[in-house]
Amino acid sequence: MDTTELQMLYAAGERDFHNVDLCSATLCYIDLRGANLLRANLRHANLRWADLRQANLSWADLRGADLSWAQLDGADLSSANLKGAKMSDGTIHD
């Protein structure tokens, strides 16, 4: 799935994107509020300024992802791999 397809499906009301592969995708400013991204591959994805409020990111691969200024209020990050992920206040290392 590419970024355009993801945005079109989300705009049409789809919220279930579990196991989606968006490795290295550019998702700046994307609105994915409430999306199910369980076990999604978001490794090295650019998620700057993304709206991920209430999203299910459990077990997601976010290694090396750029989450600078992303909105994560209420997001489920349980068991997500955030090693090397960039945040607006620093990078996560182990």
Language-model segments: residues:
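Tandem repeat scaffolds
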Residues: 1-94
